[in-house]
């Protein structure tokens, strides 16, 4: 009895009930098997109709190399609703419920296909073993055959003919083609689970049918409520306006959202793959992307690259931020599935478009409104998304920027003011140290400069503080000279003033100053040489005779018209170079022999520069007298070339010039 029950259970599960000619069994057992076989055939006839429907819809859902998926890279968007067969009302109760349950289970199982792990496969196999022992043979056999080997049982293009196939020989032959009889243990079934990824996921659909059927009635109520809500609002273009293709697209989105909330998965923003997959459902075959939503809402909604280009619009409130974020993230993949959400702030566009008060995306008008800048902004308006019109308005309200030339002039004036302030502070600092008498002498000297020594036509501004003209072309050319940092030392201040004054002079005055500097440098070198020779030991008499002779020849023969006394220009340049009023106190404190500084200060204390130049004239005469001695000796024939007539004539000329200088 135990062996018979085990064999009967094996025949029920694996379908191993084929007859053989050499097998003999008792009549009673044979009759019971025939009765059971007839019952199995009757149940198979009804079960095969539902199985055929499941096969057809499952093949339609899979992304295989089918004929309807070759042209379209995306799956059919309305496979969950619009692919229902037009059956009669008599069998709609049973067939439609099973068919809808299967479709809903496949829609809900879409995300599960991409989240399978090794542990999940083990749980599926354990669940399958439980279902093998609990399900009846016919139901289990039909479901497993349909889910594991759908390509063998479904044929595309037959349509409703699949529902009426009830050939017993064909059914038995199909079982033989599947090699179902070759599976003899649970190890073979386990190997079947391990072979294919899609097979394990398909078995999970069978387990999810029972949970989906319970919520199917609730989904139908939501769909009916949505249809009633859409019919309450007037639509442009179509009065009754819901097409048979646009409704399933919305239903698919609702079901996917409900499944995601039921499973506790992350939001749409955290799963871009699921969002892109749901966006693909809105694409209809043979129509553009904008057609379903244009028929549903009566206006065209901008698609890709529309989230970042909607200008002159009010920002949505906090309640619609999710819809705007989803539209920004799904840029280039289709329209947002939150279009049914009413929003009064998004409906009021910047151009007064009130054709659709329930649009989540504002319509961009082709003509700019002239009073855009006068509109009131919502409190949640983001200043970072200001439009080009507002930016232009702000730019016109702001003052014009400074040109590079104006910036340069401003920088130069600032540096000049800093230099003058530094000079004034320096003078004030040293003026407290100088006695009152010395300060009065210094002021008298400074007052005598422009009156007695300076040519008022050319050099009247040498001692005055320079005035700066921003429009001067010379200052613009010399603007690089003023870019350096201001030095607090008096030497730099004097040099700065000298450069500024020279920049205002003409070419003739500059040439005179250049010649004066050259002559002053030459006279300084001569004085330095004279002082060195007077305090040093003379090595030979020949050197003392040759050097003055060569200098005298160069001075009197080459430059016969050179002035004996310096001109006012030379004196003015010398005063600008060497005059330091704050060194008077230090010069008075110096003890010992008279130094060049004390001699200069002594001449400056007299107050007028003609008196100051008397000492220089005396020194020049002394130098001339020293040069006359060698010249006289040369005239008497002491020179080696005394025999030549040319040298004698030169000596005579030099002697005569020396006599004139003495007179």
Curated annotation (Swiss-Prot):
Q: Which InterPro entries match?
A: LNK (IPR039928)
GO:BP terms for this protein? Answer: circadian regulation of gene expression; entrainment of circadian clock; regulation of DNA-templated transcription
Description of what induces expression: Circadian-regulation. Maximum levels of expression in the subjective morning. Up-regulated by a light pulse in the middle of the night via the phytochrome family of red/far-red light photoreceptors. Up-regulated following a temperature upshift during the dark period. Repressed by members of the TOC1/PRR1 family of clock genes.
| One Gene Ontology CC term in the entry | nucleus
GO-annotated molecular function? transcription coregulator activity
Phenotype of the disrupted gene, per the record: No differences in hypocotyl length when grown in complete darkness, but longer hypocotyls in plants under continuous white or red light. Lengthened circadian cycle.
Presence of the UniProt keyword Electron transport in the record? no
Q: Where in the cell is it found?
A: Nucleus
Tissue expression remark? Expressed in roots, stems, leaves, seedlings, cotyledons, inflorescences and siliques. Highest expression in root tips, young leaves and vasculatur tissues.
Q: Which keywords annotate this record?
A: Activator, Biological rhythms, Nucleus, Transcription, Transcription regulation
Q: Where is the composition biased (Polar residues)?
A: 639-648
Residue span of region Disordered: 528-549, 590-663
Biased region (Basic and acidic residues) positions are 602-629
Q: What subunit structure does UniProt give?
A: Interacts with CCA1, LHY, REV4 and REV8, but not with PRR7 or PRR9.
- What biological function has been recorded for the protein in this entry? Transcriptional coactivator necessary for expression of the clock genes PRR5 and TOC1. Antagonizes REV8 function in the regulation of anthocyanin accumulation. Involved in red light input to the clock. Activates clock-controlled genes with afternoon peak. Mediates light inhibition of hypocotyl elongation. Unable to bind to DNA, but recruited to the evening element (EE)-containing region of the PRR5 and TOC1 promoters through its interaction with the DNA binding proteins REV8 and REV4.
Its protein name is Protein LNK2
According to its UniProt entry, this protein's organism is: Arabidopsis thaliana (Mouse-ear cress)
């Amino acid at each position: 009895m135990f062996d018979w029950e085990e064999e009967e259970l094996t025949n029920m599960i694996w379908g191993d009930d084929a007859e053989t000619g050499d097998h003999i069994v008792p009549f009673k057992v044979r009759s019971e098997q025939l009765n059971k076989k007839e019952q199995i055939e009757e149940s198979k006839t009804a079960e095969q109709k539902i199985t055929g429907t499941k096969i057809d819809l499952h093949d339609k859902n899979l992304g295989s190399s089918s004929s309807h998926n070759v042209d379209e890279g995306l799956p059919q968007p309305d496979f969950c609703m619009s692919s229902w067969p037009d059956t009669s009302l008599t069998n709609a109760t049973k067939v439609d419920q099973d068919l809808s349950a299967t479709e809903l289970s496949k829609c809900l199982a879409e995300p599960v296909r991409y989240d399978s792990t090794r542990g999940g496969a083990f749980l599926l196999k354990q669940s399958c073993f439980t279902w093998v022992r609990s399900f009846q043979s016919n139901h289990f056999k039909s479901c497993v055959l349909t889910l594991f080997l759908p390509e063998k049982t479904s044929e595309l293009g037959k349509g409703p003919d699949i529902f009426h196939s009830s050939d017993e020989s064909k059914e038995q032959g199909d079982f033989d083609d599947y090699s179902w009889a070759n599976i003899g243990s649970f190890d073979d079934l386990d190997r079947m689970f391990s072979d294919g990824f899609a097979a394990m996921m398909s078995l999970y659909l069978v387990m999810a049918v029972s949970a989906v059927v319970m919520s199917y009635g609730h989904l139908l109520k939501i769909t009916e409520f949505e249809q009633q809500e859409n019919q309450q609002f007037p639509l442009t273009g179509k009065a009754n306006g819901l097409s048979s293709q646009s409704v399933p697209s919305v239903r698919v989105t609702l079901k996917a959202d409900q499944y995601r909330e039921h499973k506790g998965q992350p939001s749409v923003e955290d799963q871009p793959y699921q969002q892109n997959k749901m966006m693909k459902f809105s694409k209809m075959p043979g129509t553009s992307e904008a057609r379903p939503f244009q028929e549903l809402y009566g206006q065209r909604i901008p698609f890709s690259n529309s989230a970042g280009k909607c200008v002159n619009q009010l920002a949505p409130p906090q309640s619609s931020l999710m819809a705007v974020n989803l539209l920004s993230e799904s840029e280039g993949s289709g329209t947002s599935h939150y279009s049914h959400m009413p929003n009064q702030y998004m409906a009021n566009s910047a151009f007064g478009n009130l054709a659709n008060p329930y649009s989540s995306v504002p319509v961009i008008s082709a003509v700019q409104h002239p009073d855009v800048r006068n509109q009131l902004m919502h409190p949640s308006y983001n200043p970072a998304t200001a439009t080009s019109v507002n930016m232009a308005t702000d730019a016109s309200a702001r003052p014009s920027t400074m040109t590079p030339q104006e910036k340069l002039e401003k920088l130069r004036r600032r540096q000049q003011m800093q230099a003058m302030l530094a000079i004034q502070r320096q003078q004030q600092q040293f003026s407290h140290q100088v006695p009152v008498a010395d300060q009065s002498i210094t002021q008298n000297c400074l007052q005598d400069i422009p009156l007695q020594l300076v040519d008022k036509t050319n050099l009247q501004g040498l001692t005055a503080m320079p005035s700066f003209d921003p429009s001067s072309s010379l200052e613009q050319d010399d603007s690089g000279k003023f870019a350096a940092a201001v030095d607090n030392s008096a030497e730099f201040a004097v040099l700065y003033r000298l450069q500024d004054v020279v920049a205002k002079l003409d070419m003739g005055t500059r040439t005179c100053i250049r010649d004066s500097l050259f002559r002053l440098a030459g006279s300084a070198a001569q004085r330095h040489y004279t002082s060195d020779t007077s305090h040093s030991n003379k090595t030979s008499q020949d050197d003392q005779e040759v050097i003055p002779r060569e200098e005298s020849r160069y001075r009197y023969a080459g430059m016969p018209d050179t002035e004996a006394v310096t001109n006012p220009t030379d004196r003015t340049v010398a005063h600008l170079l060497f005059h330091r009023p704050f060194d008077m106190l230090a010069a008075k404190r110096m003890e010992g022999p008279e130094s060049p500084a004390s001699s200069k200060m002594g001449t400056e204390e007299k107050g007028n520069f003609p008196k100051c130049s008397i000492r220089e004239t005396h020194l020049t005469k002394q130098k001339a007298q020293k040069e006359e001695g060698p010249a006289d000796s040369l005239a008497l024939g002491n020179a080696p070339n005394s025999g030549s007539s040319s040298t004698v004539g030169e000596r005579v000329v030099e002697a005569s010039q020396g006599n004139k200088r003495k007179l």
